[in-house]
C-alpha cells in the first residue's frame, strides 16, 4: 500500500524562499514565536490580521521596527559592554539600509547573525539544505 503526498508540499517550497525561511528560523531561535507566525502568514500570502488581534499585531510591528531604529553610531565596529542599556542582540539585529532597499516588504527588519547558526542543530541545518536544494 502506498501513500500519495499532496502536491501542496511542493507549492510550499516555491512560496517561501530560503531567505524567508531563515528569517522565520531566526525569529524562532530568538524566542519571538509570535513574530515568526506573522512572518509565515505574510510569506504564504495571508493577512496576519485575519488570524491575530489588531493590538497584538500592532505590538509585534512596533517591537520589530524598534530593532532598526538603533542609531548607526552604535554599530560602527565598537564593542558594547554587557552593562550597556542596549542589548547586544538588538544591535546585531539592526537591519542595514541596503537590506531595506532590497526587501519587498519593509514591515519586517531582520539581519542574519553569524553566531546564530550555533543555535540551529546541525542535523536540522543539513536536512533543510538538502530539502531546499532538491526543490529549487
Curated annotation (Swiss-Prot):
Biased composition (Polar residues): 94-109
Gene Ontology annotations of biological process type: heterocyst development
Species annotation: Nostoc sp. (strain PCC 7120 / SAG 25.82 / UTEX 2576)
Described purpose of this protein according to its UniProt entry: Delays heterocyst differentiation and commitment when nitrogen is limiting. Interplay between the 4 HetP paralogs controls the timing of commitment to heterocyst formation and its duration. Epistatic analysis show that the 3 paralogs act upstream of hetP to delay commitment (asl1930, alr3234) or inhibit development (alr2902). Asl1930 and Alr3234 must also attenuate the activity of Alr2902. When only this homolog is present no heterocysts are formed, showing it inhibits development. Ectopic expression partially complements a hetP deletion.
Complex and partners: In bacterial two-hybrid assays interacts robustly with HetR and Alr3234 and weakly with itself, HetP and Asl1930.
Deletion consequences: Single deletion, no change in heterocyst differentiation, in a double hetP-asr2902 deletion no heterocysts appear before 48 hours, by 120 hours only 3% heterocysts form. A triple asl1930-alr2902-alr3234 deletion makes 50% more heterocysts than wild-type (although they are not active for N(2) fixation), while a quadruple hetP-asl1930-alr2902-alr3234 deletion has delayed development but makes wild-type levels of N(2)-fixing heterocysts by 72 hours.
Name this polypeptide is given: HetP-like commitment protein Alr2902
UniProt miscellaneous comment: In Nostoc filaments, approximately every 10th vegetative cell terminally differentiates into a heterocyst specialized for nitrogen fixation under nitrogen deficiency.
Family, as annotated: Belongs to the HetP family.
Residue span of region Disordered: 94-120
Keywords: Heterocyst
Top-level taxonomy: Bacteria, Bacillati, Cyanobacteriota, Cyanophyceae, Nostocales
Protein induction: Transcription is up-regulated by 6 hours after nitrogen stepdown, and remains high for at least 24 hours.
Entry comment, domain topic: The N-terminus (residues 1-68) complements a hetP deletion for heterocyst formation but only partially restores nitrogenase activity; it partially bypasses the requirement for heterocyst differentiation master regulator hetR.
Amino acid at each position: 500500500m502506498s501513500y500519495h503526498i499532496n502536491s501542496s508540499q511542493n507549492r510550499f517550497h516555491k512560496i517561501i524562499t530560503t531567505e524567508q525561511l531563515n528569517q522565520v528560523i531566526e525569529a524562532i531561535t530568538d524566542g519571538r514565536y509570535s513574530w515568526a507566525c506573522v512572518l509565515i502568514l505574510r510569506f504564504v500570502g495571508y493577512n496576519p490580521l485575519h488570524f491575530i488581534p489588531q493590538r497584538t499585531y500592532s505590538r509585534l510591528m512596533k517591537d520589530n521596527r524598534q530593532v532598526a531604529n538603533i542609531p548607526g553610531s552604535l554599530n560602527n565596529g565598537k564593542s558594547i559592554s554587557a552593562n550597556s542599556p542596549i542589548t547586544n542582540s538588538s544591535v546585531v539585529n539592526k537591519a542595514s539600509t541596503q537590506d531595506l532597499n532590497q526587501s519587498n516588504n519593509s514591515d519586517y527588519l531582520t539581519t542574519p547573525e553569524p553566531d546564530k547558526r550555533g543555535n540551529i542543530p546541525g542535523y536540522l541545518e543539513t536536512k533543510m539544505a538538502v530539502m531546499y536544494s532538491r526543490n529549487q
